[in-house]
Regions:
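A residue-level marker of the well-folded mature domains of exported/periplasmic proteins
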Residues: 1-164
Length: 164
């Protein structure tokens, strides 16, 4: 039987839609099943509540994808309060230091994470500025890759002094 996955989205935006569409495309043709997808508003308290609902509704969840590490924190707390830590893995995103540390320590509940590079923001700002000051049209699609963080490479993404 394939893995059963619960998804926590951010807010209804283009960015969130693109992440979810890419996630769904990656699963296409696999035996993995998306149980549910709800918005948690990029917020750990909302994510906690959504995850509590998932835990009550679904007796079997193999994995949870929280589209951001702040939401993953709320998800992890809900799972811990339900005593189901050994039943599912959680994947977030953004490279929050507390999550990266747990990956470094080989926490079985947090096998991987992904970066959302600051270059995404600086590139978008630069292209927006060029659009206003240049006569050249700024068109096209730009993809800035994220990095997969694993126990083997987590140390290079761990910054203990980071505020995030």
């Amino acid at each position: 039987a394939g893995a059963k996955i619960a998804v926590l989205r951010g807010i209804p935006t283009t960015l969130d839609n693109e992440r979810v569409e890419a996630f769904q495309a990656a699963l296409e043709g696999s035996d993995k099943e998306i149980l549910d997808m709800q918005y948690a508003n990029w917020n750990r308290d909302d994510a906690f509540n959504v995850m509590q609902d998932y835990l009550a509704k679904y007796p079997e969840i193999d994995a949870v994808w929280a589209a951001d590490d702040d939401m993953a924190v709320g998800v992890l707390e809900a799972i811990a309060q339900a005593g189901r830590e050994d039943q599912m893995v959680v994947v977030g995103g953004a490279g929050m230091k507390d999550i990266i540390k747990r990956i470094m320590d080989k926490d079985p509940q947090l096998p991987v994470n992904v970066t959302y590079p600051p270059a995404l923001i600086s590139s978008a700002i630069e292209m927006t500025a060029l659009n206003f000051v240049s006569s050249a049209p700024m068109t096209g699609r730009y993809i800035i890759s994220s990095q997969l963080i694993t126990p083997e490479n987590a140390e290079q993404y761990y910054f203990p002094e980071s505020p995030f």
